[in-house]
Regions:
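Short, well-ordered beta-to-alpha junction loops that form the rim of enzyme active sites
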Residues: 130-133, 187
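A metal-dependent hydrolase metal-coordination microenvironment
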Residues: 2-126, 130, 137-139, 143-147, ...
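Short acidic/histidine-rich active-site segments
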Residues: 180-187
Length: 187
């Protein structure tokens, strides 16, 4: 089998920007997760626990980078949710490790996807809309969101557990309304 990409030459890196540890709903310690991904040949990882910001600088190696990040979610009526993964760069992030967003969560600071995106950008982070099909949102629920780095078009956990990890249709609609937005997949 021949590997093909859009580019014939260049440096290519494999990574995962959406995974959880035992700090939220994952089943492994952050250091064990990082070790498994390194052993599988990944170059980068973001441990994005729910409502807990993780920096994990101690897990970085010369050939492996752990991006700081979190996943924030908002419940909507009719069993729908917005899930947004925010990732920082070590040079730009201004949110401390293990920050729980308690004050922001109870007020109006993080009450809409747009406010989450703006808050995270003001603190040196970019935001990706996570697994819209699994979250049961309608494309109309997300079409007016601005400032996203991209959308997660495939989430393997959602596909494996519930057969609803493929969000290509949402991405297609979002592109039609918003023009350029990157797409991401996670395992």
């Amino acid at each position: 089998m021949q590997k093909r990409t859009l580019y014939q030459s260049g440096k290519f890196y494999k990574g995962n920007l959406h995974t959880h540890s035992i700090r939220s709903d994952g089943d492994s310690e952050p250091q064990d997760i990082a070790q498994r991904y390194r052993e599988e040949g990944y170059s980068f990882l973001a441990i994005t626990d729910h409502w807990i910001y993780g920096v994990h600088e101690e897990l970085n190696r010369e050939d492996f980078l752990v991006f700081p990040g979190t996943e924030l979610d908002l419940e909507l009526p009719e069993r729908k949710d917005h899930h947004l993964v925010s990732i920082g760069l070590p040079e730009t992030n201004r949110i401390p490790d293990d920050y729980r967003f308690e004050r922001e969560r109870t007020g109006n600071t993080l009450c809409t996807p747009q406010r989450i995106i703006e808050y995270m950008a003001a603190h040196g982070n970019v935001t990706i809309y996570a697994h819209p099909y699994w979250s049961k949102v309608d494309s109309t629920d997300i079409k007016n969101i601005h400032g996203l780095l991209g959308m997660e078009i495939y989430n393997h956990v959602a596909e494996f557990e519930d057969s609803n990890g493929n969000s290509e249709t949402y991405y297609d609609h979002f592109l039609f309304v918003r023009n350029r937005t990157f797409c991401f997949a996670c395992d």
